[in-house]
Amino acid sequence: MSSVVVVGTQWGDEGKGKITDFLSENAEAIARYQGGNNAGHTIKFDGVTYKLHLIPSGIFYKEKISVIGNGMVVDPKALVEELKYLHDKGVDTSNLRISNRAHIILPYHIRIDEADEERKGANKIGTTKKGIGPAYMDKAARVGIRIIDLLDKETFKEKLEHNLGEKNRLLERFYELEGFKLEDILEEYYDYGQQFKEYVCDTSVVLNDALDDGKRVLFEGAQGVMLDIDQGTYPFVTSSNPIAGGVTIGSGVGPSKINHVVGVAKAYTTRVGDGPFPTELFDSIGDTIREVGHEYGTTTGRPRRVGWFDSVVVRHARRVSGLTDLSLTLLDVLTGIETLKICVAYKLDGKTITEFPASLKDLARCEPVYEELPGWTEDITGVTSLDDLPVNCRHYMERIAQLTGVQVSMFSVGPDRAQTHVIKSVWRLA
């Protein structure tokens, strides 16, 4: 039995999809455990670029099981569209398994999400307006509708009818928007469920059976630790738990069955949406990194905010997710920058702090304390091992490992799978 969890250590968009895809080669089951179609990941497979939002990146290996876990919120319409997108590209999806316990996103969740962001104005969270938050709210309020409910028309109608009474009052009286009619949703969404019912099962059983049979299971997180609802920059967070602890809740696999946790970190830092960002760059270096790194959201197309590598953030991720390994991505983007900076601590009201503050008011006042390192000019996109990297690049990686307290076990120097390199296997048994 061997299991690996892949988590983002920053604010998402760290390259988790690419690393998950790479590690999938040695896994026999790949599972997502939280989030929904608010997270996009881009994967290159056999020279073709794919953009996925819901379906795990292991879908391209037809002999491996790909799991949408119970902790996810699934937009049935988006799922059907994504399946069609894959089928149109000739991808076999018979290896997909969808948890019957996962909650679904309905049109009223999306409308409420949009209206709420609009209402907040300058205080908006910066959501993707995909209905994720409102769906998780319904789950916590015990009025959510699950996949298993969607497949039973009578149950679906009963729950939908009950929810529409409340949602329409909210939309019409509070947001002054038009509500929904039962018939607007019932037939269309029941039909979506029928289109993917062949994949629906108890995925906790599937995953535990795989682990008990000695198979390798990979758990794929969405977003990142700093977007975790408990450990992130609240309230500028997502509505679920991307940290490694979210695996046990969102997949139905106990913590004793988790072996390694791989934290994926960019060689710099990015963020989409609002909220404090201590190392953010507003100069030409920031613009260069954004353009060279193609730092635009997979889901929204929004330009990402760019900053220097922040070891305070990644240390926080190490602690709350129990990181055993680090995978450093997009090193090639930093090529040509004469002097690189790493944030080693923050200055808050004249005092040096080395741990990430819980208060956003404090975080907004934090000034980064930087350590400067010489950059490199050599093209590193074609390297095949750690030894091929320029000395300054290796020093940069070593310093990140020292400052974060996590060994760098993998690094990536480009978008293709062949540009991801292993220093130490994360599938090791010890």
UniProtKB/Swiss-Prot annotation:
Cofactor: Mg(2+)
Predominant subcellular localization, coarse grouping: cytoplasm
Protein location: Cytoplasm
Residues binding IMP, per UniProt: D13, E14, G15, K16, N38, A39, G40, H41, T128, R142, Q223, T238, R302
Binding annotation for Mg(2+): D13, G40
Enzyme Commission code(s) on record: 6.3.4.4
UniProt entry tagged with the keyword Magnesium: yes
Binding site for GTP: 12-18, 40-42, 304, 330-332, 412-414
GO molecular function: adenylosuccinate synthase activity; GTP binding; magnesium ion binding
Note on how the cofactor is bound: Binds 1 Mg(2+) ion per subunit.
SUPFAM superfamilies attached to this UniProt entry: P-loop containing nucleoside triphosphate hydrolases (SSF52540)
Record keywords, A-Z: Cytoplasm, GTP-binding, Ligase, Magnesium, Metal-binding, Nucleotide-binding, Purine biosynthesis
GO cellular component term of the entry, any: cytoplasm
Active site (catalytic residues): D13, H41
Residues where substrate binds: T298, T299, T300, G301, R302, P303, R304
Protein's GO biological process: 'de novo' AMP biosynthetic process; IMP metabolic process
Protein family (similarity comment): Belongs to the adenylosuccinate synthetase family.
Record's function text: Plays an important role in the de novo pathway of purine nucleotide biosynthesis. Catalyzes the first committed step in the biosynthesis of AMP from IMP.
Oligomer status and interactors: Homodimer.
Record NCBIfam families: PRK01117.1, purA
Stated name of the protein: Adenylosuccinate synthetase
Gene source species: Listeria monocytogenes serotype 4a (strain HCC23)
